[in-house]
């Protein structure tokens, strides 16, 4: 039998019982932003040292559930927040962490309230400078043109497909359809998972328009993707 070397796993930080940690983003200094979805909180875990675990620092409490953080420029993040269970209202915030200290209060800038259809949010990724893609928790991907000196942030539906739909009653607890997404800049494909359908798909992206260039393509599927 072939022996597979096991990775060493260490506890970096601990959160209280009942916290649902949804996502993370590593800052340039090695510290880690962590979203506690069910508490509407964003935390910063100091860069790990030899003395583990380290103590997390609360960064901000949002009005909605905190879901995802994407870095656009060094230490500048776009944070998505949603009411995923009732109103499906969704917001996008700009969070400038440059020069931030643990004892310093920080106020995220609300740059966008997502328009209809209100679907809630889940994963998000940077497609190119100035363009963010955010996954609706039902069956669509938003394109967000980020703000610049001349224009405010704008959102529109980038892609919608049946393989992104959730299947009510298919799994307990209920699982989303479209979930995570990542853009592979080297190959020009956007990859996404559809949790309730046990699918991993990809879409070719036009390098000039940053729009979908063809229909979604099957990558993998099965119970392990649930």
Each model region followed by its residue ranges:
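Beta-propeller fold detector
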Residues: 10-13, 53-61, 103-113, 152-163, ...
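Beta-rich, blade/repeat-based domains predominating
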Residues: 14-29, 61-86, 114-132, 138, ...
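Beta-propeller domains
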Residues: 33-58
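Short loop/turn segments immediately following the C-termini of beta-strands
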Residues: 37, 81-84, 136-138, 146, ...
